[in-house]
Regions:
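Charge-lined substrate channels and their catalytic hotspots, especially those that engage the 3′ end
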Residues: 8
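A short, conserved acidic/glycine-rich loop-to-beta-strand motif
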Residues: 20-31
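Short, structurally constrained coil/turn elements
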Residues: 19-21, 43, 97
Length: 134
């Protein structure tokens, strides 16, 4: 994926370990300033994904898929059973597990850097973050 993420990975792992029953994937999420360019999600009160919208014209939220996941072994087994040379996680896996994907919100820093403008912005923002914490 073309994302830059700064987060507390121990907290992310802890969230996965303590996720609701019957969930097999924990997805990192973030607030995007450009929801039309991202896969955005809608979650229930437990933080479980109920809807996923990939780069739609009228996104229903600004909470986006960070494309960073922790998965159970059962998810890997499912992917192997697909018998594909290339598995597209957004197309082949996420829809199958809809309603069984827990979310972890990264409030520290996450930016899609898939174009020059966002890449340059990430350089400025992360330089600012590091100066602020030094």
């Amino acid at each position: 994926a073309d994302n830059l993420s700064i987060c507390d990975y121990k907290d992310f792992i802890s969230a996965h370990k303590n996720r609701p029953a019957n969930t097999e994937i924990t997805m990192m999420t973030f607030t995007t300033d450009d929801p039309k360019s991202c896969g955005v999600i809608k979650i229930d009160n437990s933080g479980i994904i109920q809807e996923f919208h990939e780069k739609v014209q009228n996104p229903p939220s600004t909470i986006a898929n960070g494309a960073v996941y922790i998965v159970e072994a059962s998810v890997i087994s499912y992917m192997e059973r697909l018998k594909k040379v290339k598995v597209d996680f957004s197309v082949d896996v996420l829809p199958y597990y809809m309603g069984r994907i827990f979310t972890y919100y990264n409030g520290l820093y996450h930016r899609d850097i898939g174009n020059i403008r966002s890449y340059e912005l990430a350089q400025i923002e992360t330089n600012f973050l590091y100066r602020k914490t030094s």
